[in-house]
UniProtKB/Swiss-Prot annotation:
It comes from the Bacteria. Belongs to the DMRL synthase family. It holds the Pfam family DMRL_synthase. The gene is ribH. The active site is at residue 90. Its EC number is 2.5.1.78. This is 6,7-dimethyl-8-ribityllumazine synthase. It is an enzyme of class 2 (transferase).
């Protein structure tokens, strides 16, 4: 006997997306945003309809992502940022708290809030993940957001 599997169609058409982007390491985060908007368009969405909110850095993403998710005209939020390791423990605090805060916001709002924050050792690694050889993690985050919206719709049917 075969189990019933929920297999939602991956289309952005009709999905109201918001993206919160950290301004810190802006050279990288702009590339993540570009990749995210391109992915949304590839999935059938209109990038002009995406709500984008710039925040000072990755530490501020959870609050803004939560507020965006609370809006009735938003189905999912993608949080984009870049935290690059330095010589102090600042990296661990920012990256860990951003991840934890975004998870809490997602569970509280019951809307997908996708972690698209790069955590790398060097600026070069960040560039690679923002459109270089390692792809664009902003695009991957949008694919995840759309899949989650469609999966939650399928579960609710």
């Amino acid at each position: 006997m075969k189990p019933k599997t929920l297999s939602p169609i991956l289309t952005a058409k009709g999905v109201r997306l918001a993206i919160a982007v950290g301004r810190f390491n802006e050279r990288v985060t702009k590339l993540l945003l570009e990749g995210a908007l391109e992915a949304y368009a590839r999935l059938g969405g209109d990038p002009a309809e995406v709500l984008v909110a710039w925040v000072p850095g990755s530490f501020e993403l959870p609050l803004v992502a939560k507020r965006l998710a609370q809006r009735p005209d938003v189905d999912a939020v993608v949080a984009l940022g870049a935290v690059i390791r330095g010589e102090t423990p600042h990296f661990e605090y920012v990256a860990g708290q951003a991840a934890s805060g975004l998870m809490q916001a997602m569970l509280q709002t019951e809307k997908p809030i996708v972690f698209g924050v790069l955590t790398t050792n060097t600026p070069e690694e960040a560039q690679e993940r923002a459109g270089g050889k390692a792809g664009n993690k902003g695009a991957e985050a949008v694919f995840t957001a759309i899949e989650m919206v469609r999966l939650l719709e399928a579960i609710s049917r």
